[in-house]
Amino acid sequence: MIIKPFNAVHIGLFVFAAAVIMLLYFCLSRTKEKTRRWVIVAICIANIVGFLIYKVALSHDADFLRISGIVRFNWWNELPLQLCNINMFLIPIGLLTGRRSITGFSFFVAPLGAVMALVFPESAFCGYSLFLPRMLGFYGTHIVIFICGISLATLGIYRPRLGDFPGIYLTLCCLAGGAHAVNLILRRTVCPFANYFYTYPADISILRLFWRWIPCPLLYLLPGLLILGAYMLTLWGTFALCEKAGASFGKHHKK
C-alpha cells in the first residue's frame, strides 16, 4: 500500500479520520463534557506514547537517514516542537486547565499543521509502503492530531469565535519566534540542522515556494499566515452554519 499525496491510500486516510470523528461524536455527544474532555486527553496521551515509539523506530531506520541526507540520527532534532505535534501536549493542557486561548489555538492550528504535514510530506515519508514503521508512525500520529483537533469542536468542547483570531495569531507568532530561537541555539551547539516550525527552508514543496518568494529564515513563513486566516474563516463559518442549522432543526422539531 504505497502512500503519497492524493492517491487512493492517502485519500482513504482522511476518510478514515472523518469516520473516527463521526464515531466519537455519536458515542460521546450525550455524555458529560468532563467525560468528553478526558477521552480526548486519553487519546492524546496514547498518541504521545505512539510518537515516542515511532521516534525510537526512526532512530534505527537507516533508509530514513539515507533519504534525509543525515549521517547520524540526532534526538535533538526529533523533539515534539513542530507546529502539529506540539499540540499533542497543548490539547491536554488546554482541556485540563480550561484555557480557551490554548484550546482555540489547538482547534485551528493542530488540524492545519497535521494536514500540511500529510499533504506536503518530506521525501522520506512519500512514495513508500504505509506499513513501514516510519510511515505508520508519521501518518498515524498526524492523523490522530487532526482527529483530536477537529473533535474539540464537534464534541462541543470548543466553539470557534471570530474574537479568538487575534489571540491565535499572537500565540502562533510567539511559538514560531520561540522555535526559531531554539533552532538558533541547537544549530550552534548539538544539532546543526534543527528546524522546528520549519523556520529554515525544508524539503517540502510549499515551503520551497515560500522561500523563493521571501529568502529569509522565519520571515519566509509569512504567506502561511494568509493560509491560516482563510482556513480559520472557513472552519468558523462551517461550524457557525452547522450550529445555526442545528438550532433551526431543534426549534422546528419542538413545534
Predicted regions span which residues?
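Membrane-interface transmembrane-helix boundary segments in multi-pass integral membrane proteins
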Residues: 1-16, 163, 167-169, 174, ...
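Hydrophobic core of alpha-helical transmembrane segments in multi-pass integral membrane proteins
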Residues: 10-29, 44-55, 176, 180, ...
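Alpha-helical transmembrane segments in multipass membrane proteins, preferentially the mid-helix core
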Residues: 20-26, 90-91, 144-163
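Membrane-interface helix-boundary motifs at transmembrane edges
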Residues: 27-40, 96-104, 155-166
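Aromatic-anchored segments of alpha-helical transmembrane domains
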Residues: 46-56, 110-122, 172-183
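Juxtamembrane "helix-exit" motif on the non-cytosolic side of transmembrane helices
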Residues: 54-67, 119-130
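Non-cytosolic membrane-interface motifs at loop->transmembrane helix junctions
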Residues: 65-80, 127-140
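Membrane-proximal helix-loop-helix units in multi-pass membrane proteins
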Residues: 95-149, 153
